[in-house]
A protein has these predicted regions:
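Membrane-interface segments at or immediately adjacent to transmembrane helices
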Residues: 187-266
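Transmembrane and membrane-interface helices of multi-pass
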Residues: 2-210
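Alpha-helix initiation and N-capping motif
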Residues: 122-125, 215-219, 239, 288, ...
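Membrane-interface micro-motifs in multi-pass membrane enzymes
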Residues: 113, 120-122, 207-218, 306-310, ...
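Residues that form generic nucleotide/phosphate-binding pockets
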Residues: 14, 104, 131, 225, ...
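Short amphipathic alpha-helical surface patches that serve as generic macromolecular interface elements
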Residues: 95-98, 125, 216, 406, ...
Length: 553
């Protein structure tokens, strides 16, 4: 330590007596936010289909207004921290951590869920440990290590040089709140945001997050989303208006005296989809034979999901409430952003009729704040992976199996319920990431294709293993329900298609889609990429004719 202090004393003395050295030191301080802006955008762009270098060059040459805004925000924050601390190294450390971690989270989230890091995702910080399972299967690209290393090296140099702001404390105390105030005005003030147009930006909430983050860079895109945090009431919105709108949907007549309330089960099957719809792939056997067998005797077909590859919470919310998320900001998480009071849902409707209402998820119930939101939707209980009464099975990949969910549903159905029970189940077994998810010895569905790479074949093999396991449990639940004495109705549906490689890898390689840019898809391709299977079955004659005509609903 003594030797280190001597070295630092010599460095300080050299800088004080040599103006060029002092100039270089302060130039490094001045350029630090520029480095963070460049490296942060590069980290975020690592998940882009055109490559980080191309996207960064485009940002600097064509969308430089967006780059300048993001860089300005970092300068304002860094300047405020330097004023507070006086010493540059701790201010640089805090600034570096924030503006390196945030784009890194954006990259990781995009790789895992195919959704960018949005302002309301800050509410998920308490569930950060939930992502550790995904991270273990994620391959960190080499450029990310270099970018992290560059920031660490920059911080190390500043720590050695130890620049100190040569300004009296009174001016520093005044400067910090002024800079933070400017930061607030630049990000949150409506008048200032309206002037974003001077930089070639729109102050309106983005509708296409991929385009937003690709064209504007991470930090500017993140800030543009801040306008979506609060939504005003639509015109003519009132309780009276809603009562009038819903009046036409009231039932014409009540059920007969001999009507027996059925138990109702709704199961969101993670990434449940029919892989045989891929072009130029021949399967040796059907991955979902039980679904097809049940569908042939019951009602079902294809439904159009509101999301692809991730964002389970949105189709889940839509099915539970009957409300669309398409009018909400892109990338929304309804439970976190909008569910703060009791709202209508089918769970509440059944609860009002005397049913017990139970939510079951074979993962952490705190994720997406389901544990807080479900009671507001009318659920009596929300059970997570640690609350299950049935045996937990981890014999298929890193997540609890669908077998665990089906056994818990059976357990709940066997419990006494005065009138009936409504169960919402959410599976987890077939969640991505799919690369190397299972040992090849566990693959149970084979196929041939001349267009898939080795990695893409690995992805598809692992997905087929998972979806066939899900299908097996659908068949098991079907047999249980059909042999049950009490009337029971089941809805089983897939929430979205799986993510099978970067840039829609498997889908593009097989020719299922003709472009890796979603905006260029044909109407037929859009249906293909957003349509998931569903089936409705019951163990009694409902007495109602099914209305769907087989087209996606």
């Amino acid at each position: 330590m003594k030797k280190l202090r001597e070295i630092r004393t010599k460095i300080d003395a050299y800088i004080q007596t040599h103006k060029p050295a002092a100039f270089i030191m302060w130039l490094l301080v001045l350029l630090f936010p520029l480095w963070l802006s460049l490296s942060g955008n590069a980290i975020s762009f690592l998940s882009g289909e055109d490559g980080a270098a191309v996207l960064l060059c485009t940002l600097l040459t064509e969308n430089y207004g967006a780059f300048l805004l993001g860089m300005l925000l970092i300068y304002l924050f860094f300047g405020a921290m330097v004023c507070l601390w006086k010493h540059v190294p701790p201010a640089a450390l805090l600034t570096g951590l924030i503006f390196t971690i945030m784009p890194t989270v954006d990259f990781l989230k995009t790789e895992i869920l195919k959704e960018h890091f949005l302002p309301w995702d800050m509410l998920l910080a308490k569930n950060a440990d939930s992502f550790t399972t995904f991270l273990s299967a994620l391959k960190i690209p080499t450029p990310l290590w270099w970018l992290w290393g560059g920031t660490v090296a920059y911080l190390a140099v500043l720590a050695i040089l130890r620049p100190t702001l040569p300004i009296a404390w009174k001016k520093r105390v005044l400067g910090a709140p002024i800079l933070l105030g400017c930061l607030y005005l630049c990000t949150m003030n409506g008048t200032v945001r309206a002037d974003y147009s001077l930089l070639g930006l729109s102050s309106e909430a983005p509708t296409d997050q991929t385009k937003n983050y690709t064209e504007n860079g991470f930090l500017t895109a993140f800030v543009l989303n801040l306008s979506s945090l609060n939504m005003g009431d639509p015109d003519n919105y009132s309780e009276r208006y809603l009562e009038k709108a819903f009046a036409q949907y009231q039932p014409d007549e009540a059920s007969g005296a001999d009507f027996q309330n059925p138990d109702v089960i709704v199961i969101l099957s993670e990434s449940f989809w029919d892989p045989t719809t891929l072009k130029n792939v021949s399967f040796t056997e059907d991955p979902i034979p039980n679904y097809r067998r049940i569908l042939a005797e019951n009602h079902g077909g294809s439904m159009v999901s509101c999301t692809f590859g991730g964002g389970t919470v949105r189709p889940e919310f839509e099915i539970l409430t009957g409300m669309t998320t398409s009018m909400l900001p892109s990338g929304n998480v309804p439970y976190q952003q909008y569910v703060f009071n009791n709202i209508y849902s089918y769970a509440r409707e059944f609860k009002n009729q005397g049913y017990d209402t139970i939510g079951i998820h074979t993962y952490q119930k705190e994720f997406y704040e389901r544990d807080r939101a479900y009671p507001l939707l009318g659920f009596d209980e929300m059970l997570g992976e640690y609350d299950l009464h049935a045996e937990q099975h981890f014999n298929s990949g890193p997540f609890l199996t669908d077998e665990s969910l089906v056994e818990e549903i059976m357990y709940q159905l066997e419990q006494p319920h005065e009138k009936g029970v409504f169960i919402q189940g959410i599976t987890m077994e077939n969640h991505g990431l799919y690369l190397n998810k299972f040992d090849p010895s566990e693959w149970n569905i084979d196929f041939t294709s001349d267009t898939l790479s080795e990695e893409e074949s690995n992805l598809l093999h692992n997905y087929c293993k998972g979806v066939s396991d899900s299908d097996a449990q659908l068949g098991r639940l079907y047999e249980y329900v059909m042999n049950r004495e009490k009337p029971t109705v089941v809805l089983w549906y897939g929430d979205h298609l799986p993510t099978l490689g970067n840039d829609f890898g498997v889908y593009a390689s097989t020719g299922t889609i003709t472009s890796t840019t979603a905006a260029n898809w044909t109407e037929e391709e859009k249906y293909q990429m957003f349509s998931t299977p569903y089936v409705v079955f019951s163990n009694y004659d409902t007495g109602h004719e099914y209305r769907a005509d087989g087209t996606p609903v």
